[in-house]
A protein has these predicted regions:
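Short beta->alpha connector loops at strand-helix junctions that form conserved
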Residues: 121-122, 139-144
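Conserved coil-to-alpha-helix start sites within the AMP-binding
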Residues: 100-104, 123-126
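A short helix-loop-beta submotif of the ANL/AMP-binding
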Residues: 132-137
Length: 199
């Protein structure tokens, strides 16, 4: 029995991302430092290994609440408060995920509907998540400005796409370019986004 015709039709819109294709192509080359997928260039630190072992020895290996371990969410809340002066309630405003892709997948699944548009400064690698939920990607070409999204380009894309835009993904440091934004650049983008009802 072939059940493939019963799969989500949006799966046909998804291709393996270019960064994954590139990573697969170079992964067999000896001595290559693979920074393609945001992998660190170091192994797990000893204190992290020891903490994981201690947690297992203490039988802390069962399911947590669906938002993640409260102590971890409290630590995350304190971290962003100290570092960025952003204040979130650990109890109901922070969700622990295993990485950025899971976090984006959960978020985009919650906010997007078929017909919605997500603006994505290119190059980037999150198109499959967006397409899976039936939304569309509109890439913003950033090559002219060393892969930095400018407020002018963002404003132009928001106006061109109109009310269809549901979200803008700002991923930095960005794979595959390594670009990062200054505080001033982010404030300029925030100034544009404040005028629109987008995530």
């Amino acid at each position: 029995m072939d059940l493939t015709k019963r799969f989500n039709k949006n799966l046909n819109r998804i291709e393996i991302s270019l960064i994954r294709q590139f990573d697969q192509a170079i992964s067999e080359i000896p001595g290559v430092l693979r920074l393609t997928l945001g992998e660190p260039d170091f192994t797990t630190p000893e204190h992290v290994k020891e903490a994981a072992k201690a947690a297992i020895d203490a039988n802390q290996s069962h399911y947590t609440g669906m938002s993640g371990l409260l102590a971890l969410r409290q630590a995350a809340s304190q971290f962003v408060a100290d570092k960025y002066n952003l204040h979130y309630r650990a109890e109901d405003e922070i969700l622990v995920t295993i990485g950025a892709t899971e976090a984006l997948s959960a978020t985009l699944t919650a906010i997007l509907e078929p017909g919605d548009v997500v603006l994505l400064p290119a190059p980037a690698g999150y198109e499959p998540i967006i397409k899976l939920v039936g939304a569309s990607v509109v890439e913003i070409d950033t090559r002219a400005h060393q892969f930095i999204l400018t407020p002018e380009a963002l404003e132009e894309s928001l106006q061109e796409q109109g009310n269809r835009v549901k979200a803008v993904i700002l991923n930095y440091p960005a794979n595959p370019t390594g670009v990062t934004y200054s505080k001033e650049q982010m404030q300029a983008l925030a100034g544009v986004l404040k005028k629109y009802q987008v995530f």
